[in-house]
Amino acid sequence: MENKPHILVVDDNAMILRNIKCILDPYYSVAVAPSGLHAFLAIGKKKPDLILLDYEMPEMNGKEVLEKLKSDEEMKDIPVAFLTSIDTKEVVVELLALKPAGYLLKPVESQALLNKVFEIIGK
C-alpha cells in the first residue's frame, strides 16, 4: 500500500465536504472537519500535507484558523489553500494578504481542485 499525501478539508457545509472528499479520495488520504475547532483536533491526530480551508465559517473563520496555524511551531509549515464563494476584490486582497498556498472559488470543479492540490503538494 502506497503512502498517499494526507489532506484535511475544513468546511461547515457537509455537502461540500462530501464532494471534495469524493474528488480527492482516489489520489490522496482525506480527512474532513466541519469547523476550525474540529480542524485542530484532526491535525492533532494526523498532521496533513495540505489543508483546504473554507474562508467563511461560523465560530472560527478561515483567517482565524490560518493565524492560529502560523503561530504554532508544529503547524506553521502546513500549506493552506482557501476555499471561498466570495470573489469580490476586497476578499481576494484580504485572502492574498494572508499568504495562503492558494485559493479556489466555490463551487470548485474537479479538475481545478486536483490541479491546485498537485500544484501545492506536487504529488
Language model: regions and residue ranges:
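Receiver (REC) domain active-site loop signature in two-component systems and cognate sites
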Residues: 57
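Short amphipathic alpha-helix used as the core "switch/output" element in two-component signaling
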Residues: 41, 63-76
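Active-site beta3 strand of CheY-like receiver
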Residues: 46-52
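Two-component/phosphorelay signaling modules centered on CheY-like receiver
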Residues: 14-31
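Helix N-cap/capping motif at the beta->alpha junctions
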Residues: 32-41, 62
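C-terminal output helix
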Residues: 15, 108-117
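Alpha4 helix (beta4-alpha4-beta5 surface) of REC/receiver domains from two-component response regulators
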Residues: 64, 87-104, 115
